[in-house]
Curated annotation (Swiss-Prot):
This is Cytochrome b5. SMART domains: Cyt-b5. It comes from Borago officinalis (Bourrache). PANTHER family: CYTOCHROME B5 (PTHR19359), CYTOCHROME B5 ISOFORM B (PTHR19359:SF129). Membrane bound hemoprotein which function as an electron carrier for several membrane bound oxygenases. Belongs to the cytochrome b5 family. It is a single-pass membrane protein. SUPFAM superfamilies: Cytochrome b5-like heme/steroid binding domain.
Length: 132
């Protein structure tokens, strides 16, 4: 286990001459790797000063890329210094909306009533023609 760093300490290392990242609670000095990174140094620099675990995992790095992290390890992060993420929960929607049901019935009637009238007119016309 290495030295314990706070988020503020790690955040100071945020340029191309001194770049540290936090991934899975560990701190890595990736300054020497900036030029070799396949995505370019901008990708790594944009992940400084925060927990970059999600950014790292979302890319889907290979097992060899994950193994490379060991050579850049400098310590661990003090988890109490990382602000907790607030998870967004959408507001609950009612499963049944009586207002929408009323609108549906009105639209259904607006469609069916003319059809019934048309069917009645055709039926009357057909009935009166065949009896004459």
């Amino acid at each position: 286990m290495g030295k314990i760093f706070t988020l503020a300490e790690v955040a100071q290392h945020n340029n191309s001459k001194d770049c540290w990242l936090i991934i899975n609670g560990k701190v890595y000095d990736v300054t020497k790797f900036l030029e070799d990174h396949p995505g370019g140094d901008d990708v790594l620099l944009s992940a400084t000063g925060k927990d970059a675990t999600d950014d790292f995992e979302d890319i889907g790095h290979s097992s060899s890329a994950k193994a490379m992290l060991d050579e850049y390890y400098v310590g661990d992060i003090d988890s109490s210094s990382i602000p907790s993420q607030v998870k967004y929960t959408p507001p609950k929607q009612p499963l049944y909306n009586p207002d929408k049901t009323r609108e549906f019935v009105i639209k259904l009637l607006q469609f069916l009533v003319p059809l019934v009238i048309l069917a009645g007119a055709i039926g009357i016309r057909f009935y009166t023609k065949s009896s004459a």
